[in-house]
């Protein structure tokens, strides 16, 4: 089984969601039991809704448990910052053409959220930055065309 990189923050969020779902599980079972008491199961909307909710909850639990089982948790805060861009690093780049400054944290696929500045380790920008150092200039082929960035700061937050 191949390990999948995940930040410590990503692991924490998954564990919190798993905990929430595990606490929800008995409530769903209770709702199914109450709906069963209402009689005929063929036309019992409450029963069918509770069973559907149970199926969704169980699928989410299995999915999270699987993700945690294959996760290789990388906590960059415990690493010495060498100025090298690695998984989990927060990188501030300057677009050489527009002088626009952008900050990205390189995270796992499930953690990516471009609006929050978290980009997937498999994205073109992350692939172009990983392995480079603070002060390097990199040319990256993006869906919007070729971009040239200067790596301004590399932080292990």
From Swiss-Prot:
PROSITE patterns: GREAB_1, GREAB_2. One of its GO terms (molecular function) is DNA binding. It comes from the Bacteria. It comes from Vibrio cholerae serotype O1 (strain ATCC 39315 / El Tor Inaba N16961). SUPFAM superfamilies: FKBP-like, GreA transcript cleavage protein, N-terminal domain. One of its GO terms (biological process) is regulation of DNA-templated transcription elongation. Necessary for efficient RNA polymerase transcription elongation past template-encoded arresting sites. The arresting sites in DNA have the property of trapping a certain fraction of elongating RNA polymerases that pass through, resulting in locked ternary complexes. Cleavage of the nascent transcript by cleavage factors such as GreA or GreB allows the resumption of elongation from the new 3'terminus. GreA releases sequences of 2 to 3 nucleotides. InterPro entries: GreA/GreB_C_sf, TF_GreA/GreB_CS, Tscrpt_elong_fac_GreA, Tscrpt_elong_fac_GreA/B, Tscrpt_elong_fac_GreA/B_C, Tscrpt_elong_fac_GreA/B_fam, Tscrpt_elong_fac_GreA/B_N, Tscrpt_elong_fac_GreA/B_N_sf. This is Transcription elongation factor GreA. Belongs to the GreA/GreB family. The keyword Transcription applies. The gene is greA. Residues 14-37 form a coiled coil. Keywords: Coiled coil, DNA-binding, Transcription, Transcription regulation.
